[in-house]
Amino acid sequence: MAAADPAPTHARERRDVVVPVSGPEDPPERAWLVLPHRHPVSTLLDETRDAVVGLAETLAAVLPVTVLAHPRDAGAARLVPPEVDLLRAPVGSPLLGRTGPSFIRRPEGLAAVAWRSAAGLTGTGPLDGAAATAVAEAAGLPLLTPLLCAPRGAWVTDGEGTAVVAADPVLDGRINGAWTPGQVAAEFAALLGITRVLWVPPAPRPDTGPWGGPGHLASWVRLQGDGEAAVHWRGDRFHPEHPYAAAALRFLQGADDAAGRPLRVRTVTGAAQPAEYDPAERGPRSLLDTLPLGAAVLRPAFEDAAGEEAAAAACTALHPGLPQLSFPAPPLLRLAGALNDLVLLQPRP
């Protein structure tokens, strides 16, 4: 697209009132997941499907859950428990939290945003775009389709007008052509109500899960509101997660949020890998990979006592007062992805 037109989008229909997009602490109305019917490693498909169903059951203890399954998935009805809604849709990977729709509040109510696909460059597949349509139709929400590709996994927000955005992929010329940082920031302001965009500069970031592509930025950076932020950390300079963690930390320290407050940034060291672990596990063992659910918070669980203690303490600091649910992180990283990669939370109207 031409660089002179910074952000053509259907959202231009209503720009008089733009409410900042929901932050991580906003209570959700429903959780959405995808039950995959294919897998990059075919021998792991059944185990992955079982893990997704287990995650749905865990979430269903505190809020309504819908699982999307492909129309040709004959076994889905037997797997999905009765307390979880099953919806047929032409979906692909289970990375709905990374590639699914974003939700915005407009004067007339909640709407969904289907970002332009970056299939093949961010771990997405050709069918992932259909998930946004399926979710919007099932939820009865209008669907906006901007020309910008800013997948939900590439940015996080505090719900107060500030967003941290990964320069890679959003400023990747293969994905967004000649879009400049200023043009992207203008689109974020018009569509999402975000008035302060902070860019994490490009740095090596390990893939998360067997579908490939960088995992959700929420595993690396958490904006907590009131000028507070947390960064997933690895102090060992030889650790493959150190370069991206260091890039995020350097950039955010001293940066201001949308209210003009200097961000107070702290580091949260990820859980350690035990001496014996499955080398197929891909992605950060991040303690920031949590999902506030309103009445509770879902956090990653780990196989060793030290990891569990650290995860519980980090979750308490991030979400004080919320009861904690947990789900094993190492199997998910081996089979599918992080919690924020897999779970899409729809905010209340």
Protein language model annotation of sequence segments:
Residues A2-P349:
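The feature marks the mature, well-folded catalytic cores of soluble enzymes
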